[in-house]
Amino acid sequence: MRFHTTWLILAFAGQAVAGPSATEVRDTVRAYRQQHEPAIVSEFAQLLAIPNHALDSPNIRKNAELIARTFRDRQVETRLLEIEGAPPVVFGKLDVPGATRTVTFYAHYDGQPTRQPNWTTEPFQPTLRRPDGSAVDLGSLPQRLDPESRLFARSASDDKAPIIAIVTALDALRASQWRPSVNLRFFFEGEEEVGSPHLAALLKAYAAELKTDLWVICDGPVHQDGSKLVYFGVRGATALDITVYGPNRGLHSGHYGNWAPNPIVLLTHLLDSMRDTQARILIPGFYDDVRAPTPAELKAAREMPNHDAQIKRNLGLARTEAQPASLQTQLMLPALNIRGIAGGAVGDAAANVISSEATASIDFRLVPNQTPDGVRRLVEQHVERQGYFIVRKPPDEATRLAHPMIALLAWDNEGSYPAARTPVDNPLAQHVARVVEQMAGAKIVVAPTLGGSVPMHLFQGDANTPVVGVPLANFDNNQHAANENLRLQNLWDAIEIFAGLFTGEPQP
């Protein structure tokens, strides 16, 4: 898209105008965007047209190569970081003479599968629709586009939008002959939607090149009320399936009831010993390692918009757990969720039978200072205290006869990782929040942590590098579902936010 070498000469030779105010950056970048809306959307649509499921290796590489070319066209030193068995990471490097800080921006270019049957248009045929649902011809876009229009395609919001917003912000700065105030790094992953199985190894293999003062995670939607959001942490996660056993085959409940142990009854009592109805985890020692929220985190949580009453109405809930605690306060605590229970049958399939086994699937959300290994140890000790003999595979007949109560525990090792949280008073993290608010021109939401889990701890690393999240997509974007979309105004806002982050001067 335009001005490829001019900026390199003017901005980095020291001839550019330095130190623009946040207002100047926002207004100038906005004017640039208004002049180039068709080109921006067309370039975005080109990227969205390439299928991008993480396991589709040929198309994943096509995505990576297009992104790499896109950044090289902006005079960003770009290469593909690769290790065996992993999709390439697109890594961009832009050093600024005199800059003392390095900031790395993360996004991912892979997307969820598109098996959902109710896509209005094909997921890899990007379609721009006006608010009334009518399509806009991408081949003949008007000079100015309705900001409430939406671009429909897989990964329009999750998570290719930050990539096109970043390159457009670079274009706008180049056109204005302004240079960034920090050294910039760009890290675009190709397997986030399948759990980032190679991320740890890749970060280790390229540790020297990836040294940075701050990571900015550009993924996810803004707050539900439309406010811009900056988050400072995520919860960790681990999960397991527990299977308990009764007779070695189903038994007639009339002939054997009150005599043969019922595994469904055993399982429900075991689960009841682990969690109460107010979300309190009853496993001894579970809270011993939990780091309590800091006063600054509690203050930030209290200042977040409280939409609990509306959410309750929307969800048809007359009560919530741990009343009167707010949703945001509860998200800073560990949690035990029972994902599902299987055993016997119900409805028309029900029979008067004592089942031979019953299984529960459980996930834990962890907070700082907790580790998956520590939680596993506590859970297994608790199960044993309840009288169970723990096995790792279905018991044979000898094991059944030797132990009156048996539990098979199967942990999810690949999907387990600790929590991560950057202090909300960290100067670099505060700088990000301040810039986002300046660019937004309105009060933003600062969240000490999100309720979900991503491997943010890998970016923190042993150096405890600050990590903050700056989600940019509209909250109603249908990510992971049919008709995923990005509201154009969210894209326009993202361009301004990135320009502000590139040019804002972090305090020491």
Q: What function would you assign to each model-found segment?
A:
Residues 4-15:
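Bacterial N-terminal signal peptides
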Residues 19-156, 163, 173, 178-182, ...:
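Acidic/His- and Gly-rich active-site-bordering loop/insert found
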Residues 109-111, 187-195, 218-223, 246-248, ...:
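Acidic, glycine-rich active-site loops and adjacent beta-strand->loop/helix elements
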Residues 147-233:
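Acidic/histidine-rich catalytic neighborhood of metal-dependent amide-processing enzymes
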Residues 157, 248, 363-372, 417:
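A generic structural motif
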Residues 224-225, 282-357, 368-382, 386, ...:
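An extended, acidic, His-containing surface patch that forms the Zn2+-binding/catalytic region
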Residues 231-245, 332, 468-470:
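Flexible glycine/proline-rich, aromatic-decorated loop/lid segments
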Residues 257-278:
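A short core secondary-structure module
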